[in-house]
Amino acid sequence: MAKKIIGSLKLQVKAGQANPSPPVGPALGQRGLNIMAFVKEFNAKTADLEPGTPTPVIITYYQDKSFSLELKTPPASFLLKKAAGLAPVGKRNRPKGSAKPGREVAGTVAVAQIRKIAEAKMKDLNANDVEAAMQIILGSAKSCGIEVKG
């Protein structure tokens, strides 16, 4: 007999840097899940990614308090800012897009980079082909104030 699913939980955790402190600890603890088991499994699964890359994860938890992880690709905005070479700024030391998208340009990327990002995110996007996925990524670039050349 299959395990009974109680629910699922979406988190965005930095690759290889999961720890039991907030937001991970409280989110798992209030559901009675083993926090350290999650931390070890997540860090092991994200060991091949660049450390610090924000990684969305869907945690499905079962009646016997066990869980399974489904890792997603990093957010399109993160990949675009990285491709544009935007420098980290602010208290959280993260790259920022334009404060006024459409009026100010924060950085530029080539169409080839957009295609590469679209191909990487294809499994997580609601698109039938790479061209449709590129349109989604182009919309994200426009929202970040990143100009596309070529």
From Swiss-Prot:
Record's GO cellular component terms: cytosolic large ribosomal subunit
InterPro entries: Ribosomal_uL11 (IPR000911), Ribosomal_uL11_bac-typ (IPR006519), Ribosomal_uL11_C (IPR020783), Ribosomal_uL11_C_sf (IPR036769), Ribosomal_uL11_N (IPR020784), Ribosomal_uL11_N_sf (IPR036796)
Record keywords: Methylation, Ribonucleoprotein, Ribosomal protein, RNA-binding, rRNA-binding
CDD domains the record matches: Ribosomal_L11
Pfam families: Ribosomal_L11 (PF00298), Ribosomal_L11_N (PF03946)
Post-translational modification: One or more lysine residues are methylated.
Keyword Transcription: no
GO MF annotation terms: large ribosomal subunit rRNA binding; structural constituent of ribosome
Gene Ontology biological process terms from the UniProt entry: translation
Function of the protein: Forms part of the ribosomal stalk which helps the ribosome interact with GTP-bound translation factors.
HAMAP family documented for this protein: Ribosomal_uL11 (MF_00736)
Subunit-structure text: Part of the ribosomal stalk of the 50S ribosomal subunit. Interacts with L10 and the large rRNA to form the base of the stalk. L10 forms an elongated spine to which L12 dimers bind in a sequential fashion forming a multimeric L10(L12)X complex.
Record-linked PANTHER family: 60S RIBOSOMAL PROTEIN L12, LARGE RIBOSOMAL SUBUNIT PROTEIN UL11M
UniProt family annotation: Belongs to the universal ribosomal protein uL11 family.
Designated name of the protein: Large ribosomal subunit protein uL11
Organism the protein comes from: Cereibacter sphaeroides (strain ATCC 17025 / ATH 2.4.3) (Rhodobacter sphaeroides)
Organismal lineage: Bacteria, Pseudomonadati, Pseudomonadota, Alphaproteobacteria, Rhodobacterales
Gene: rplK
